[in-house]
Amino acid sequence: MGKLLELEGNLFEVMKEIRDELGSPNDLTIREVALAGSFTRCAVVFLCGLTDKDNVYKYVVRTLQYEEVQNEAAVVQTLLDRFISIAEVGKKTTFPDIINAILAGDTVILIDNIQTAIIINSRAWEKRSLEPPVTEDLIRGPRVGLNEDINVNKMLIRRSLRDPKLRFQSYIMGKRSQKEVTLVYIEDIINPHIVKELDRRLQSIVTDVVLETGTIEQLIQDNNLSPFPQFLNTERPDNIIASLAKGKAAILVDGSPFALIAPLVFVDIFQSVEDHYERWVIGTLLRFLRMGSGIIAVLLPAMYVALVSYHQGLIPSKLAYSIAGAREGVPFPAYIETLMMALTMELIREAGIRLPKPMGQTIGIVGGLVIGEAAVNAGIVNPFLVIIIAVTAIATFSLPVYSITITFRILLFVFVLAATAFGLYGIILALIALAIHITNLTSVGIPYTTPIAPAFYKDWKEEFIRMPKSMLKDRPEYLQTKDSTIRPKERK
């Protein structure tokens, strides 16, 4: 596939090449017709299921059969002028482009003795209706999420962001999948270096199939060995719009209801778009609550193991006696029972996700209660540990970014093992190693710990806490945006 579409005298050879290239599938339709008032033969080619077949027969085939072409020397331009009132039209001259158009759901018109094919946009596959986001449900905010159609997702963004400087930069990726990938940004806000870097990384992708944004994320992230996400996954259009307005970029993939937002910094994982819908005090307190939840999710089980196994003297006397009494008869050391309960919680959580929704919720709640109660009654674990694991699980659920909850769940086991080996000293060493890793991590070249280190104190009022809207007049300084002002100074 690389030659010109040669139709010098035999239209049937080209149709045979198309059938051979596609494997003569049952859904391939090739309708041969003669142009009205002429002996010139042509063929209408499309794939059923990807194309609106009724409209093809109603408008395309009927036009070819019943509307005469007066100037056969300019037949391609004449047909283009006629079909432009029906749909988006174009022309292609190479065989690979013809095949790609057919596979994309377009209708191709081949004309005998003409080296140019007419392409008509007639894509009409089934689409999921707009629904609320599944993974980012909010109390207050829009009730619509992205879906699998990239054009619908673009519409959702444009509908709420009517800015002439909004840019959609498209790519076709995947040697076999031929998926549309779109880079979205606001031209007069975003730092050009971010656009240039993302464009370079996207154009460097070489792969057979692109199925979802996760494929793109893994191919363009800064550090492939880090458990921390370097792009923010979201299915909320308002989250995308808020990020674009800050000076960030978004990546859409056709067939995926999720978008990627870059760059991502560590403080972003504790933020929710809902923070901007509530008063500043509530938004700030919610952020601090999520930060505390992150600490609990990672450190609470490890602290239990360290205190019970190594540093009993740091536990208040009454609490120490209670824990000792509860652990009486438990056959396993603290780290074994902690790892068992943590693994059990992960199994329950995973089962709840994979099972049908009503059954999954039941398994998650009832399964945790039943297994915890049975384990305590059997003397396998103590009640204090059940409470600790339950609080840890609840803390992970309070984090707004699902991908970071997976990271924190992995870190939980790392810190438990460190506490098992060296007690509190192991936890401190693990924290130092984690801090070193995070400070060396970047997202599209932006340090992951920004705006804390390097310090951009001016950004703390928006990124670290959430000050009143009247005080938020500038975009994040660490993004080095073209237009740094959100609210122009009021005239006196």
UniProtKB/Swiss-Prot annotation:
Q: How does it sit in the membrane?
A: Multi-pass membrane protein
Q: Write down what this protein is called.
A: Spore germination protein GerLA
Describe its function.
Contributes to the L-alanine germination response.
Q: Which GO terms describe its cellular component?
A: membrane
Q: Which organism is it from?
A: Bacillus cereus
- A GO BP annotation: spore germination
Coarsely, its chief localization is: membrane
Where do transmembrane segments lie in this chain?
295-315, 384-404, 410-430
Location of the protein in the cell: Membrane
Give the record's keywords alphabetically: Germination, Membrane, Transmembrane, Transmembrane helix
What family does the database annotate? Answer: Belongs to the GerABKA family.
* Domain of life the protein comes from: Bacteria
* InterPro entries cross-referenced by the UniProt entry: Spore_Ger, UPF0353/GerABKA_families
